[in-house]
Regions:
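Boundary/junction segments of secreted and surface-exposed precursor proteins
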Residues: 1-18
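Short polybasic amphipathic segments
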Residues: 36-44, 105-114
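A short, surface-exposed beta-strand/turn
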Residues: 91-110
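Predominantly extracellular/secreted and cell-surface proteins with exposed
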Residues: 17-93
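A short, sequence-level motif marking secondary-structure junctions
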Residues: 57-63, 97-102, 125-131
Length: 134
């Protein structure tokens, strides 16, 4: 799965981080259904914080019944966990990304980061696109 975008920014929802809140976080991703497949990248930025995935520990792809087409991919959801660095400190991440078609406004994101920083964000993309690929 590839893509990126920002969420949530215009709905009044906030993300929580290190005891504070703000509207919006951005992410870019290239993730495989098999954690051993390379490369796997996840970058998340919000406020003055930055998380970078170093190792994808687990990944599972599934189909929640909503069509990600085009193109057909056989799945539309990836969820998993990994380790990385947040603000140069060790951190862990769990995530779930769903491709619900074009242009991406129905795509959903859920990201939880702990360790070097904390972030909890979930919702529909407000800009960008998540794309499932074979």
């Amino acid at each position: 799965m590839t893509g990126g975008g920002n969420e949530p920014t215009t709905t009044g929802q906030t993300v929580t981080f290190n005891g504070g809140t703000q509207q919006g976080a951005t992410q870019g991703l290239l993730l495989h259904c098999n954690a051993a497949s390379q490369p796997n990248n996840l970058q998340v930025n919000w406020a003055n914080n930055s998380f970078h995935l170093q190792q994808l520990v687990s990944a599972t792809c599934s189909n929640d019944g909503m069509s990600p087409q085009p193109p057909p991919a056989g799945f539309d959801v990836i969820q998993g966990s990994g380790t990385g660095r947040c603000n140069k400190l060790a951190a862990t991440v769990t995530f779930k990304f769903a491709d619900h078609g074009e242009p991406g406004t129905n795509d959903t994101v859920e990201i939880h980061i702990t360790g070097g920083c904390t972030l909890d964000v979930s919702g529909n993309l407000q800009g960008g696109d998540i794309q499932a690929h074979n």
